């Protein structure tokens, strides 16, 4: 004779946090297919019969019945925050003062509250349920995103120094390693710039600096509107300037400090070694200067003087 099927009875599903009629003979939840169910005592069935009749069938219950919440206690002075995640949507964080969270929320049924109180069940971990309404959850912010906004919005860097990674699973390192606000970003940029401060070309050789020719500015130089590329001051007739191998002219006090730190021309970035010297730089390509037979200091053009210095 075949054995009679066991009676289904009433069970409590810890995954759905709701009273259900299990699927036999597997004893699984018909809503979430979970086997984490517990049989209700006979006394609890009678006490909750009225609430079961009023609430209707499981299929007609609103989605707010299956709310799951998680409570985080923030550092002193910040109170508490509760996250509520529904099966078909997301309840954004609500901030309040320190103290117990309201036990009866709009989205939690009376029976669910009594069941949790009876079994001493802990508040389940906040998670995104995908068994129903998966399409509606597309584009909904994740819990990690909400926590990141919470950290960026209300937790000060001084308060985060003692938290470490702790419950803030989205922070994968020390919170003080992050840039907090505009000032923190400015600090990082300043540090990066300081790292590149001394990474330029090496200083020019002292002998090459002393060997740079000194010429005097003539009226032809002034007529072309030449100026010192460093201080941007116009040259005056009879003024002594230093000429680099690339034919660029500079005030002595402007170019010497630069060459003592960098072996390059401030204008064309050519070295003083002569290997990459620009014989006709763009600024002097179309300039021609006539020789003066009466003045020994301005008897040749800047180009001729540079060639003479190289030949010697």
UniProtKB/Swiss-Prot annotation:
Keywords: Cytoplasm, Metal-binding, Nucleus, Transferase, Ubl conjugation pathway, Zinc, Zinc-finger. Pathway: Protein modification; protein ubiquitination. The keyword Thylakoid does not apply. Residues 44-55, 290-301 have a biased composition (Low complexity). GO terms for cellular component: cytoplasm; nucleus. The keyword Cytoplasm applies. InterPro entries: RNF126-like_zinc-ribbon (IPR039525), RNF126_RING-H2 (IPR039571), Znf_RING (IPR001841), Znf_RING/FYVE/PHD (IPR013083). Residues 41-63, 96-139, 275-312 are annotated as: Disordered. GO terms for molecular function: ubiquitin protein ligase activity; zinc ion binding. It catalyses: S-ubiquitinyl-[E2 ubiquitin-conjugating enzyme]-L-cysteine + [acceptor protein]-L-lysine = [E2 ubiquitin-conjugating enzyme]-L-cysteine + N(6)-ubiquitinyl-[acceptor protein]-L-lysine. GO terms for biological process: positive regulation of double-strand break repair via homologous recombination; protein K27-linked ubiquitination; protein K29-linked ubiquitination; protein ubiquitination; ubiquitin-dependent protein catabolic process. This is E3 ubiquitin-protein ligase RNF126-B. Residues 124-134 have a biased composition (Basic residues).
């Amino acid at each position: 004779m075949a054995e009679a099927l066991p009676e289904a009875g009433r069970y409590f599903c810890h995954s759905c946090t709701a009273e259900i009629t299990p699927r036999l003979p597997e004893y699984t939840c018909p809503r979430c297919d979970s086997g984490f169910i517990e049989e209700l005592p006979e006394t609890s069935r009678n006490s909750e019969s009225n609430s079961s009749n009023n609430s209707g069938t499981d299929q007609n219950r609103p989605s707010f019945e299956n709310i799951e919440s998680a409570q985080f206690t923030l550092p002193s002075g910040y109170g508490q925050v509760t996250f509520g995640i529904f099966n078909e949507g997301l309840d954004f964080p609500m901030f309040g003062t320190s103290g117990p969270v309201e036990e009866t929320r709009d989205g939690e049924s009376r029976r669910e509250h009594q069941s949790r109180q009876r079994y001493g069940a802990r508040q389940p971990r906040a998670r995104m349920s995908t068994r129903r309404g998966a399409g509606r959850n597309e584009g909904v912010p994740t819990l990690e995103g909400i926590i990141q906004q919470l950290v960026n919005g209300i937790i000060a860097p001084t308060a985060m120094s003692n938290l470490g990674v702790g419950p803030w699973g989205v922070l994968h390192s020390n919170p003080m390693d992050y840039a907090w606000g505009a000032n923190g970003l400015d600090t990082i940029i300043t540090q990066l710039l300081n790292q590149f401060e001394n990474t330029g070309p090496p200083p020019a050789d002292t002998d090459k600096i002393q060997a740079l020719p000194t010429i005097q500015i003539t009226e032809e130089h002034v007529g072309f509107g030449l100026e010192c590329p460093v201080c941007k001051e116009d040259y005056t007739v009879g003024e002594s300037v230093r000429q680099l191998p690339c034919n660029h002219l500079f005030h002595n006090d402007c170019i010497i400090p630069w060459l003592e730190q960098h072996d390059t021309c401030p204008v064309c970035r050519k070295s003083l070694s002569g290997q990459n010297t620009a014989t006709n730089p763009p600024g002097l390509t179309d300039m021609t200067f006539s020789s003066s037979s009466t003045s020994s200091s301005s008897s040749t053009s800047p180009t001729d003087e540079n060639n003479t210095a190289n030949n010697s």
